[in-house]
């Protein structure tokens, strides 16, 4: 835009008065929000219209709305005006159908020219077809107006110029220049200098920064605040009347203090120019940024200190608990301290364990047709599983200690032994109820307790499980049926008694090495033992780790397990029910068919008149 735009008024019509423009400028300077939101210069419009009457009407409407208008009767004249005075044109309003050069050609020419392509072009026509509008928009038009044009449409044309300049970044520079001009005029009228406003803003900002500094207990910005206060004192010295410190120079502008320009006004005060204002703005912005950074740094330091204190407290608690556990045989840590210490120590390990538990939940690899075998599983157990197993053993010790006051002497003997581990595995028992639910199709999961000092169950060097499984199979092949039925009855009676008195829900199975033929499950506090039906079904499934639920694959066995007869029995029952249903359906359909045929014959015998049934005379029927 031109250089003379800075000195124009806010609302400058071609036929307006200067006094009205000055009043509007004073009002605009009073409100900072209006100066930012409303346009600061009159929009100059180039109108290209072939019809004379339409051109005069649109020009009058545009001038009434506050625009400066340059009119052209054809496209060639409009292009000549735009080429010569492209810097004085803000908007082009052209008709699609023009003499000598059409509106489409004028639009394409403007879009191809480097100096004019940033000027928004608005097309107008009485033909409102979609194809024409689409064609204009593709060529680069900013908007399309349909004739007859309304006054409010012309009043809103400045928004296109506003958007274009806002996107190109020219508007910010023009706004700052115009705001400076308006504030200078307002200062000349009111006598309030710009240095006073700047000084008040700097003092206010410094007070805010000092308050934030005292709150954050930081001294990182004191030197900067002292420097700002010195500069503020210098400005206050500049504000004093000129007669006190130095004589009035002959020229208006004098350079002092490193190139800072000082303007002498009529009232005897010194006004620093834009360079000093820009430096003051930069200083205030830097002070604000430094204060914000200082407060953020202090908050971060407090958070880190609190975390370190918490970590040290938790480490001390864990070390104290470890030393206490080494002195005593029973290792005990409060549950909440154990949980917090584990979370504080290593987050990634716990997250991986939780993910593994979620993945392996309800996904068992055990099979009811496989036997227990003793393939070594040391390769499958990693360090994380061992740690989780020790954690579960700690929880079991806590549970045993809490229940010592209520349990008989048998449980008290167990707590004096080395720490125990739990290996839950399924035990198939026909007709055995567990937690009030019968296990007819599946196997109840029992927990095997063994001391930690003893060798692990799944070790390949010991043949405890191999002896147990082989003797259980031989018992199955050679045992009589009478003992089987008696054992089943004993199981049902004693499990009913144990469920009345039991509070814990673990099945403790003790398999001695001397007599591995009988497996005795006992509830946690009842103390009663029963003999499982090992002759009917063999041990099946796979040994699973108690902490991470990782299933260990069973080894291959040379013994072939027969198929389940219960499945065949269920299959035969289903086939019988299906055959019964088919027979019933066949009989029902046959009855319906017979009924339909009989009614059809009766209907054919009845007399009809024009397709309708009529009553039959009894005399005719008797004859």
From Swiss-Prot:
Renumbered to this chain, the Acidic residues biased-composition regions fall at: 13-23
Query: What keywords tag this UniProt record?
Result: Biological rhythms, Nucleus, Transcription, Transcription regulation, Two-component regulatory system
List the Pfam families hit by this protein, alphabetically. CCT, Response_reg
Which PROSITE patterns does the protein's record reference? Answer: CCT, RESPONSE_REGULATORY
Using the UniProt annotation, give all residue ranges assigned to the region (Disordered).
Answer: 1-23, 208-269, 395-422, 492-565
Comp. bias intervals (Basic and acidic residues): 1-12, 396-415, 508-518
Q: Does the keyword Transcription apply?
A: yes
What's a GO biological-process term for it?
A: cytokinin-activated signaling pathway
Which residue intervals are annotated with compositional bias (Polar residues) in the record?
520-561
> To which protein family does this belong?
Belongs to the ARR-like family.
Task performed by this protein: Controls photoperiodic flowering response. Seems to be one of the component of the circadian clock. Expression of several members of the ARR-like family is controlled by circadian rhythm. The particular coordinated sequential expression of PRR73, PRR37, PRR95, PRR59 and PPR1 result to circadian waves that may be at the basis of the endogenous circadian clock.
Protein name (record): Two-component response regulator-like PRR95
Organism of origin is Oryza sativa subsp. japonica
